[in-house]
């Protein structure tokens, strides 16, 4: 078997990626979230596949087909809630994974980092079209409001959003194509994940110290396979607690009402993991400006490798940038909170301050603190 896994064309790839892979001996639990994201993706694809067997993408039957899944299909309620809450777990792991990348300077591996940003955007698109499928009030109005933002694009905007809608309003054609997108995108994500791993294994993984670890590496199996399995079991435990005890805690009560184009909810908002970007969008009074800020709030992650002027790798020995990093995380949490609040004073003002702070930290404060720390080292 040993010879086979090293010589067989297919097993050789698996062996070099998950068994004999030389891995830094000091990587902490923060490095577990990559494998947890893989576990989340598998859970989402499997539960989604079973849901797709019973779901109908028609405006007249979509809402009742979801109710049918929960009431009449064997363990349909469990599959549905695992899928819905699995998306939340996915974004929690994704946020921590990206946060760890920023903290420990993993963005210097620019190909891996940029594929990660593409993965983040694709996952957001998948989650958005998936949120529309139950065809509840918030699904319908969320789809209407967010897709309407495309009309802000000069010249082609109105044509573009009518083309995406498949008509002059969000209707049957929109739901059908959103279901098609939601079905195909996870497989595109899987392909990008393989490219992400390919680039990662070209350079090797980063480590907490930020130093070169070539002199001290251990095989991935059994050390990190056991460590990752523990993480997966804890993830499953958290997901099962969420799905079995608090299944609707992260959902919106408006989505228990079938979609009604004649009745607008008091406060239209997306899922909780989009609220930070939604707050940035709302903080700019101009429609086109808001859309650009929304897109830049994600694409600005690509600026990290370009703005990095530090002579040290990661933030572990850099107290000034460390402080700014944790202010950045706190600011993100404030934006998430503001995104869920109604558009009224003082929430709009807090949102505008937090949005300016978000961009200022990345574009101004972090490069300045890097330069200050470089000068301190010279002293």
UniProtKB/Swiss-Prot annotation:
Principal localization?
mitochondrion
At which positions is heme b b562 bound? 83, 182
GO molecular function per UniProt: metal ion binding; ubiquinol-cytochrome-c reductase activity
Kindly list the cofactors needed. Answer: heme b
Task: Give the GO terms filed under biological process for this record.
Answer: mitochondrial electron transport, ubiquinol to cytochrome c
Q: What is the recorded membrane topology of this protein?
A: Multi-pass membrane protein
Q: Which CDD domains match?
A: cytochrome_b_C, Cytochrome_b_N
**Cystine pairings recorded for this chain:** none
* Locations listed in the record: Mitochondrion inner membrane
Question: How and how many cofactors are bound, per the record note?
Answer: Binds 2 heme b groups non-covalently.
* Miscellaneous comment text of the record: Heme 1 (or BL or b562) is low-potential and absorbs at about 562 nm, and heme 2 (or BH or b566) is high-potential and absorbs at about 566 nm.
Q: What PANTHER family does the annotation carry?
A: CYTOCHROME B
Which protein is depicted?
Cytochrome b
């Amino acid at each position: 078997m040993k010879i086979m896994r090293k010589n067989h064309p297919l097993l050789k790839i698996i062996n070099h990626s998950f068994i004999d892979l030389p891995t830094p001996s000091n990587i902490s639990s923060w490095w577990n979230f990559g494998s947890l994201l893989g576990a989340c993706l598998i859970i989402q694809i499997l539960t989604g596949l079973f849901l797709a067997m019973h779901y109908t993408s028609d405006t007249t039957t979509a809402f009742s087909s979801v109710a049918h899944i929960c009431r009449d299909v064997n363990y349909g309620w469990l599959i549905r809630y695992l899928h819905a809450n699995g998306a939340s777990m996915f974004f929690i792991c994704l946020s921590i994974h990206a946060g760890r990348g920023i903290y420990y300077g993993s963005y210097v591996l620019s190909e891996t980092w940029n594929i990660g940003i593409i993965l983040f955007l694709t996952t957001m698109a998948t989650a958005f079209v998936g949120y529309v499928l139950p065809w509840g009030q918030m699904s319908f109005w969320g789809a209407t409001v967010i897709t309407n933002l495309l009309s802000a694009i000069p010249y082609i905007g109105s044509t573009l959003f009518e083309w995406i809608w498949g008509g002059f309003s969000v209707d049957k054609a929109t739901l059908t194509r959103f279901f098609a997108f939601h079905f195909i995108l996870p497989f595109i994500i899987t392909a990008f994940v393989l490219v992400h791993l390919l680039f990662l294994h070209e350079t090797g993984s980063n480590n907490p110290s930020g130093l070169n670890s070539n002199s001290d590496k251990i095989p991935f199996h059994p050390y990190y396979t056991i460590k990752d399995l523990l993480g997966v079991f804890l993830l499953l435990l958290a997901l099962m607690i969420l799905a079995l005890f608090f299944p609707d805690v992260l959902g919106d009560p408006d989505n228990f009402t079938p979609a009604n184009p004649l009745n607008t909810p008091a406060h239209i908002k997306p899922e909780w993991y989009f609220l930070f970007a939604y707050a940035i969008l709302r903080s700019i009074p101009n429609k086109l400006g808001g859309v650009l800020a929304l897109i830049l709030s994600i694409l600005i992650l690509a600026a990290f490798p370009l703005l990095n002027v530090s002579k040290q790798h990661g933030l572990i020995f850099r107290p000034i940038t460390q402080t700014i990093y944790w202010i950045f995380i706190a600011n993100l949490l404030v934006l998430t909170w503001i995104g869920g609040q109604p558009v009224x004073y003082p929430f709009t003002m807090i949102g505008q301050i937090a949005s300016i702070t978000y961009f200022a930290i990345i574009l101004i404060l972090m490069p300045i603190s890097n330069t200050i720390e470089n000068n301190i080292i010279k002293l």
